[in-house]
Amino acid sequence: MTALKTTETIPLYTIRDLPIHGFRNMAQFVDYLFAGERVETGTLVAINAEKVLTAEKDVALRTLLDRAEYKYADGISIVRSIRRKYPQADVTRIAGADLWEALMERAGKEGTPVFLVGGKPDVLAQTEAKLRAQWNVNIVGSQDGYFAPEQRDALFERIRASGAQFVTVAMGSPRQEILMRDCRHHYPDALYMGVGGTYDVFTGHVKRAPLVWQNLGLEWLYRLLSQPSRIFRQFKLLKYVAYHYSGRL
């Protein structure tokens, strides 16, 4: 049974048996998460074609996704599939990196306590400094991504003791989803978000596609041209293309 939260205003769309929230725009998503007296609790997970395919073969990942309350369309292919399957759908792509920045800006305005996990030590330090300078974010703790498995419980206790209401984890999938799942068992009173390489992008260590490429839905192509080694990952996505055009969504 899925733990996905349902509301009258935010529709759910199902792609390959995976329910996904369909948001009209970024502002609606941010307002939805901050609609109460404090930010919502639960787990945010970005959904793209690669993750859909992986979840079909990886039972553990599928279980993690089923338990996440807020699954949103991060990949343009997911948005196009939703529109194909549900012609009246008013849904847009919500890029995880952009959502993270929008939530951090809102957290700064609201005074929401934030805990950052993941990234290299220097990148994490730069991320903290920029968040404080740019949006006055209330960062109550942090931990880089280089810690031993036996240190996990101590990290979970630090997060709990900090009183953080928003925890972001930059460790890549599925490591970040596993960490968030386990941390929520220890401390459920926060919103958790897996952000992959967002800290690197935010601090300028990794360059995103120009805005025109993003608006055309070609960010994947820009990444491929920048990192030719990704070609093998792109070949795997041909299976999703077949799902899309055959209507097996």
Swiss-Prot record:
The EC number(s) this enzyme carries: 2.4.1.180
Top-level taxonomic group: Bacteria
Keywords: Glycosyltransferase, Transferase
Broad enzyme group: transferase
Catalysed reactions listed for this entry: UDP-N-acetyl-alpha-D-mannosaminouronate + N-acetyl-alpha-D-glucosaminyl-di-trans,octa-cis-undecaprenyl diphosphate = beta-D-ManNAcA-(1->4)-alpha-D-GlcNAc-di-trans,octa-cis-undecaprenyl diphosphate + UDP + H(+)
Keyword Glycosyltransferase: yes
One MF term in the entry's GO annotations: lipopolysaccharide N-acetylmannosaminouronosyltransferase activity
Signal peptide: none
Keyword Transferase: yes
Pathway in which the depicted protein is active: Bacterial outer membrane biogenesis; enterobacterial common antigen biosynthesis
GO biological process, one term: enterobacterial common antigen biosynthetic process
General function of this protein: Catalyzes the synthesis of Und-PP-GlcNAc-ManNAcA (Lipid II), the second lipid-linked intermediate involved in enterobacterial common antigen (ECA) synthesis.
Similarity-based family: Belongs to the glycosyltransferase 26 family.
Protein's recorded name: UDP-N-acetyl-D-mannosaminuronic acid transferase
Originating species: Pectobacterium carotovorum subsp. carotovorum (strain PC1)
Encoding gene (name): wecG
